[in-house]
């Protein structure tokens, strides 16, 4: 009798599938598709956050560089330059009017030199661009010591021959100190121009990826919503609806503030700062020219040196308004463009009260130049004492009075633009101040809504 052995079934072996094939099979199932959509949407949300943050950083850095780093340094450099030029003019007037040691010119000179020293110490402690700023500051500090020594020597000899020391001090001021002040201004101005130009050229390109990231996330959320509606017979998934709504709100928020920040930046730079820069350069140049007028009279009797001072004076005044001042005043009243710092300002009128202040500046400048012509006519006519009295006088109709009127009007024009600049920069920072928090909250809510919204649908396929 034979026994029959039962047949042993062979185990079924699963084919070795590649990762790609496994994913392909998973995506053919509803749970697999939902898991993929969830992962893709979360990744897109994180990508959107990163791209939006990059756009934010680019915009904020531009506002920071222009509003807090370069412009204040440029203005500080121009203030130093203007104060130095005025201190130099006061030193000359001290000798020209033969004032007492406690006279107004010497007191103003000492006050301004102390102010410059304090400002340079502050500038040395706030260097942003390395040797580009450090070297001019060092030069000014070193050369100012030599300048004050020469002025002190001239003062000690002012009852005798003080001209050689005063001339040496004047040359040092113009060739070394004021040149270094201009270099400090230029270092920051070049960085401002480069930053602003690069930002304006690239801003749209840097915002575009964030927009693309938002669109990608929206498409993924919408397609997942559509897939669920088709497969689960549910019209809307609450979690995905919330995620989509939050994304739209965040996008609208970004779209609303980014152009406003950019507009504030443009207004601050092109409308306010460009005028501020022109006006500060006008002030510094005018102070320098005013010193030339005093040197012209100080060299009374020396026709050769007086001719040199006259040329220097007109070279500088032309920088403020190229051409006859009375004709330029008519041009300004008619709204016609003319060259010079004051012409640049009058061509860039933007803010309330700015035109009136700028026109008053132009009128005061024309008045000052008319009085200068009277001084030179009196000197040429042999009326030195009358010319001197007109130069150093402070009563209405005198040169110093007219110059003070000009500087006061220029200061008011500066104040209008400085106030506008400060407001625009503050507004830009205020708009950006909550963006990062809003972005973080947006991403957290979107990811949470995606996970919570899809989880119940995945749970339906578990058994």
Predicted regions located by residue number:
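Membrane-proximal N-terminal soluble sensing/regulatory segments of transmembrane proteins
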Residues: 62-139, 268-358
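Juxtamembrane interface at the cytosolic side of transmembrane helices
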Residues: 16, 20-36, 55, 204-262, ...
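Extracellular/periplasmic juxtamembrane segments that couple receptor/chemosensory ectodomains to their
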Residues: 276, 281, 392-420
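Polar/charged, Q/E/K-enriched amphipathic alpha-helical segments with strong coiled-coil propensity
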Residues: 127-201, 343-407, 425
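Hydrophobic secretory-pathway targeting helix
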Residues: 26, 30-62
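Terminal targeting segments of Actinobacterial cell-envelope proteins
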Residues: 1-31, 192-200, 423, 427, ...
């Amino acid at each position: 009798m034979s026994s029959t052995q039962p047949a042993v079934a062979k185990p079924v072996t699963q084919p070795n599938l590649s990762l790609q094939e496994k994913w392909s099979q998973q995506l053919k199932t509803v749970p697999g598709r939902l898991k993929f959509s969830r992962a893709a949407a979360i990744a897109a949300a994180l990508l959107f956050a990163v791209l939006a943050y990059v756009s934010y950083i680019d915009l904020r850095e531009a506002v920071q560089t222009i509003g807090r780093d370069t412009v204040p340094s440029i203005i500080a450099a121009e203030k130093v330059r203007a104060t130095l030029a005025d201190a130099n003019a006061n030193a000359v007037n001290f000798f020209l009017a033969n004032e007492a040691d406690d006279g107004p010119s010497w007191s103003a000179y000492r006050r301004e030199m102390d102010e410059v020293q304090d400002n340079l110490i502050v500038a040395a402690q706030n260097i942003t661009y390395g040797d580009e700023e450090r070297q001019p500051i060092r030069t000014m500090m070193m050369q100012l010591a030599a300048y004050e020594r020469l002025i002190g020597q001239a003062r000690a000899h002012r009852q005798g021959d003080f001209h050689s020391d005063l001339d040496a001090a004047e040359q040092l001021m113009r060739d070394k100190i004021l040149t270094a002040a201009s270099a400090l201004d230029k270092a920051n101005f070049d960085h401002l121009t480069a930053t602003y130009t690069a930002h304006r050229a690239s801003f749209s390109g840097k915002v575009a990826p964030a927009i693309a990231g938002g669109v990608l996330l929206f498409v993924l959320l919408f397609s997942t919503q559509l897939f669920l509606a088709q497969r689960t017979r549910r019209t809307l998934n609450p979690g995905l609806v919330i995620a989509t709504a939050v994304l739209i709100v965040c996008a609208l928020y970004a779209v609303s503030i980014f152009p406003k920040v950019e507009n504030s930046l443009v207004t601050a730079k092109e409308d306010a700062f460009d005028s501020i820069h022109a006006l500060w350069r006008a002030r510094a140049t005018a102070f320098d020219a005013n010193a030339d007028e005093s040197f012209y009279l100080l060299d009374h009797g020396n026709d050769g040196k007086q001719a040199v001072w006259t040329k220097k004076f007109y070279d500088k005044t032309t920088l403020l308004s190229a051409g006859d001042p009375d004709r330029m005043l008519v041009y300004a009243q008619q709204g016609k463009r003319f060259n010079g710092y004051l012409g640049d300002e009058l061509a860039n009128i933007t803010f309330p009260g700015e035109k009136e202040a700028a026109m008053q500046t132009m009128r005061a400048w024309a008045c000052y130049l008319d009085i200068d012509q009277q001084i030179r006519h009196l000197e040429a006519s042999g009326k030195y004492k009358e010319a001197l009295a007109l130069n150093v006088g402070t009563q209405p109709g005198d040169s110093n009075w007219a110059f003070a009127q000009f500087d006061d009007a220029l200061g008011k024009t500066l104040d209008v633009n400085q106030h506008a600049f400060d407001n625009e920069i503050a507004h830009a920072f205020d708009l950006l101040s909550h963006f990062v928090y809003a972005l973080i909250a947006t991403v957290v809510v979107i990811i949470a809504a995606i996970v919570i919204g899809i989880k119940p649908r995945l749970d339906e396929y578990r058994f």
